[in-house]
Every structure is written in structure tokens, then in C-alpha cells.
Regions:
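FIC/Doc superfamily catalytic core
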Residues: 1-127
Length: 127
């Protein structure tokens, strides 16, 4: 079982059920995709690397469904982490943070690699 601060992620006893529920969630609109992303974050299936892997996972869904990826380099660390903390109650803040930073540069290596670099920065690694 994993916790961060005062937040406990999904109990490991129920991880299979939680992941099955996440898999069944719709992902046809931006709103549905973000809702699915929030639930996957709550599932938190790994001991390390959840944030980084789920951001890549989110971009793969966005690319497949909407032809977009997130330009993570444009999203402030503090604002993003606060939006993620509050997203289980309401994902509106997260949607408003991510949506204007979507790009159609889905095959641009610089956007992808800068996003991975930013992802490490969100997790506490220095740039």
C-alpha cells in the first residue's frame, strides 16, 4: 500500500479491480481521458515511477484518440502537483491546466523528450 503525504492510493488488495475499472473507462473526449488519467493515478500500481509512467500513458491515449500530446515543458510544477492532489475531488483544475498545453506535434522528438525531462522534474529531480 502506497501513500504520499496524507493521500493513500488504492489498496493493493483491490488493485486488480481498480485497474479493471480504469481499463473500462471511456476515452473518447478530452474530459473522459483526464478522468481516466486521474483514476489511474489513484490506482498507483508501482512502488516508483507512477507519475512518470502515467504521464507517458496519458500522452499515448491523447495521441491515439485526439491526435495531440501534452507539452509538459509549459506546465508549471507547483500548479500541476496541486491540480493532481485536488483532481480526485474535481479534475476541472487539471483539465484547465493541461488543455491549453496540448499540441499536435505528436511526432516531435523534442516535445516528447522535453516532456520526459519535465516529468522527472515534477518528481523532485533537478533539471
Amino acid at each position: 500500500n502506497i501513500a504520499k503525504g496524507n493521500f493513500r492510493f488504492a489498496n493493493s488488495l483491490y488493485l486488480d479491480a481498480v485497474l479493471s475499472a480504469v481499463e473500462k473507462m471511456h476515452e473518447n473526449t478530452f474530459e473522459e481521458i483526464i478522468a481516466k488519467y486521474v483514476e489511474m493515478n489513484v490506482a498507483h500500481p508501482f512502488m516508483e515511477g507512477n507519475g512518470r509512467s502515467t504521464r507517458i500513458w496519458l500522452d499515448m491515449i491523447l495521441k491515439k484518440r485526439l491526435g495531440k500530446v501534452t507539452d509538459w515543458a509549459k506546465i508549471d510544477k507547483v500548479q500541476y502537483l496541486q491540480a493532481m492532489e485536488r483532481s480526485t475531488v474535481n479534475d476541472l483544475e487539471l483539465r484547465f491546466l493541461i488543455q491549453p498545453n496540448l499540441t499536435d506535434k505528436v511526432n516531435d522528438r523534442e516535445v516528447i523528450f522535453k516532456g520526459i525531462e519535465q516529468s522527472y522534474y515534477y518528481e523532485g529531480y533537478e533539471k
